[in-house]
Design a protein with these regions (language model features):
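Beta-strand/loop-rich accessory regions of lumenal/periplasmic or secreted enzymes
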Residues: 1-286
Length: 286
């Protein structure tokens, strides 16, 4: 078992290249480097790369199912239900270890509700970010969202304007040293559009759209052509690999960027993420 959803197919188009997993790391910013945030919280990069899925539960119309062979060999391709809930329990490899619960609820209208809970433990360092990472097989052509204008972070959104915006360029902000960018706070919905399914060189005539929408509270997201680890490993822009995938992170907590100076001043207290607390949020895929 991969420890997550292995496929999301909509109108014949595959939207997953890898199983969605909890994400705990963003690429360092200049301010993060200046305060040596990676020394204090670098264990979250390892937790982001390697996570242990300890349990999976499948509930169909209120009844617990046996999800492993040979018990699940009774199912055929025409099995249907009014509601299916798939629950994953993860443990981080941090010391001490934290627990993350991710629940997918699929209903007859085709929507997938995603509920995410992080249960912190005393002694863990501050988190850079907490959310779910979805890696798509090909590059998105664009995305549209309802939320705040431009790139926003918890401590960088006072001048943003609420509205509907479209972004056609998924490339990174061209900093001298590649770093985290492209976050959008307080988002009501997001539509990612592609003309490709599994191969960037094979474009279709029909535009395909995957929508993420809020359920209770607005969410934050970034939609980039690289993972945080790929950005982290590049010291100059030209060292980044060719862009081939779409990396969508739907976040429930985001650390601020600071910027008072870049040689020692930390992010202000209200914009930090205490990893000892509980973080919960939800969104829907449709």
């Amino acid at each position: 078992a991969q420890g997550g959803l292995e496929s999301i197919v909509k109108n014949g188009y595959e939207w997953l290249y890898r199983c969605p997993k909890p994400t705990f790391w963003r690429a360092l910013t200049d301010n993060d480097r200046g305060i040596k945030f990676h020394i204090k919280s670098g264990s979250w990069m390892a937790a982001d790369t390697f996570i242990d899925c300890q349990n999976v539960e499948v509930i169909m119309d209120g009844e617990m199912q046996k999800q492993y062979a040979p018990d699940n060999n009774i199912y055929e391709g025409d099995v249907s239900a009014d509601e299916i809930i798939v629950k994953f329990t993860y443990k981080t490899i941090s010391n001490p270890s934290a627990t993350v619960l991710v629940s997918y609820t699929v209903t007859g209208n085709g929507k997938i509700r995603v509920d995410v809970e992080y249960h912190g433990v005393k002694g863990l360092p501050e988190l850079p970010v907490f959310g779910m990472r979805f890696i798509m097989p090909t590059l998105a052509d664009s995305y549209m969202y309802e939320g705040l204008s431009g790139e926003t972070y918890p401590d960088r959104k006072a001048g943003a304007v609420k509205g509907v915006y479209q972004v056609s360029d998924l490339s990174l902000t061209p900093y001298l040293v590649p770093q985290d960018c492209g976050m959008h706070m307080d988002t009501d919905w997001l539509e990612v559009t592609r003309y490709t399914s599994l191969d960037n060189s094979r474009r279709d005539y029909f535009l395909q759209i995957l929508k993420i929408e809020k359920t209770d509270e607005p969410f934050a997201f970034s939609c980039l052509p690289y993972t945080a680890e790929e950005i982290e490993n590049a010291t100059h822009y030209e060292e980044l690999p060719p862009a081939r995938r779409t990396v969508l992170c739907v976040c429930g907590a985001v650390r601020g960027v600071g910027g008072i100076d870049s040689w020692g001043s930390d992010v202000e207290e209200p914009y930090r993420i205490n990893a000892e607390n509980v973080i919960s949020y939800s969104f829907a895929i449709c």
